[in-house]
Regions:
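Flexible glycine/proline-rich, aromatic-decorated loop/lid segments
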Residues: 2-17
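Regulatory N- and C-terminal appendages and interdomain linkers associated
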Residues: 21-159
Length: 159
């Protein structure tokens, strides 16, 4: 449901029944860990508690790796290693502060530096030219594209 947000809002929840925001986009890691913890509790009659706890302790790192892979795939970029997760967090914070549509950044900056001209000619050029975006733009442009040939697809032909 995040694809259809009018702008990035990490507190948005698409679940009509979620009055407390437990399943808000920005709380997904906490909600997933909470759910896994509940599952671990249910498994204690048939599994060792220490083994269950060990497994739960690997979740934060596994989530960060998965998030890096997913976001970089959406951006059509190759992860660089250390600092990639911090970049994603900073990008999401900027997206929310700028109130830019969630999908827009992924389209505008797909492939990194090769998309700079398209991004700066698009409807959100002013946001991308703002000083607040400059460090993120520098990072995006520094990442290697995953498959530059994908930019030849007609999808990227217009803003």
């Amino acid at each position: 449901p995040w694809r259809f947000l009018p702008y990035t809002d990490l507190s948005f929840t698409a679940a009509y029944f979620d009055q407390s925001g437990l399943y808000a986009y920005g709380r997904q890691p906490d909600a997933a860990l909470w759910n896994l913890t509940r599952l671990g509790g249910a498994l204690t009659p048939v599994a060792e508690t220490d083994a269950l706890n060990e497994g739960l302790q690997t979740f934060p790192q596994a989530f960060e790796r998965a998030m890096v892979e997913a976001f970089f795939a959406r951006l059509g970029l190759k992860p660089a290693g250390e600092g990639d997760f911090d970049f994603i967090v900073a990008l999401l914070q900027w997206m929310e502060a700028a109130r830019i549509p969630f999908e827009r950044v992924f389209f505008d900056w797909f492939g990194g530096a090769a998309s700079t001209m398209r991004a700066l000619a698009g409807p959100h050029a002013a946001l991308y030219s703002d000083a607040a975006f400059a460090p993120l733009r520098g990072k995006i442009e520094s990442f290697a594209p995953d498959d530059p040939s994908r930019l030849a697809h007609p999808y990227f032909g217009g803003a």
